[in-house]
Amino acid sequence: MPRYYCDYCDTYLTHDSQAGRKQHNRGWKHRENVKLYYEQFLAGQGVIMNPGEWLRGPAPMGSLPPRPNGPMNGGMPGGYPPRGVPPRGMMPPPGPVMRPPMFRGPPRGPPPMGAMGMRGPPGPGAMGGPPPRSIYGP
């Protein structure tokens, strides 16, 4: 059975299983070797990262980035904006403002006759009833 080789650590793993590979990848020695590997490419680009960012790994899906210290937008310390002002990412686009419709509750009472195309009961000869009787015969 082929053994697993780690390019970063330049070694073969002693336990070739998924659990063994995961444990190796979580180890401090492997993480340090990965950090050193990528630092050789970032050295000429001026990218500055502290060791904590490398060792923490990627952020879990759906998590928020860390908040900067100090007040933002004139709000309370900790980054909360003042009341009534949406957060930066939630600001509406510039332009005419359309307000959402206000819900006023259910209508009170039946609608008036003739309102909104409604009519009274059908008259003689209208669809839905028997034909009108003629005075001249059957």
From Swiss-Prot:
Keywords: Metal-binding, Nucleus, Ribonucleoprotein, RNA-binding, Zinc, Zinc-finger
Pfam family, one: zf-U1
GO biological process, one term: mRNA 5'-splice site recognition
Subcellular localization: Nucleus
Record Gene3D superfamilies: Classic Zinc Finger
Main location, first listed in the record: nucleus
Record bears the keyword Cell membrane: no
Origin superkingdom: Eukaryota
GO MF terms, alphabetically ordered: mRNA binding; pre-mRNA 5'-splice site binding; U1 snRNA binding; zinc ion binding
Span of zinc fingers (Matrin-type): 4-36
Feature: compositional bias, Pro residues: 79-113, 121-138
GO cellular component: commitment complex; U1 snRNP; U2-type prespliceosome
Sequence segments annotated as region (Disordered): 59-138
Role according to the record: Component of the spliceosomal U1 snRNP, which is essential for recognition of the pre-mRNA 5' splice-site and the subsequent assembly of the spliceosome. U1-C is directly involved in initial 5' splice-site recognition for both constitutive and regulated alternative splicing. The interaction with the 5' splice-site seems to precede base-pairing between the pre-mRNA and the U1 snRNA. Stimulates commitment or early (E) complex formation by stabilizing the base pairing of the 5' end of the U1 snRNA and the 5' splice-site region.
Family: Belongs to the U1 small nuclear ribonucleoprotein C family.
PANTHER family per the UniProt record, alphabetical: U1 SMALL NUCLEAR RIBONUCLEOPROTEIN C
Known partners and oligomeric status: U1 snRNP is composed of the 7 core Sm proteins B/B', D1, D2, D3, E, F and G that assemble in a heptameric protein ring on the Sm site of the small nuclear RNA to form the core snRNP, and at least 3 U1 snRNP-specific proteins U1-70K, U1-A and U1-C. U1-C interacts with U1 snRNA and the 5' splice-site region of the pre-mRNA.
Protein name: U1 small nuclear ribonucleoprotein C
Organism: Phytophthora infestans (strain T30-4) (Potato late blight agent)
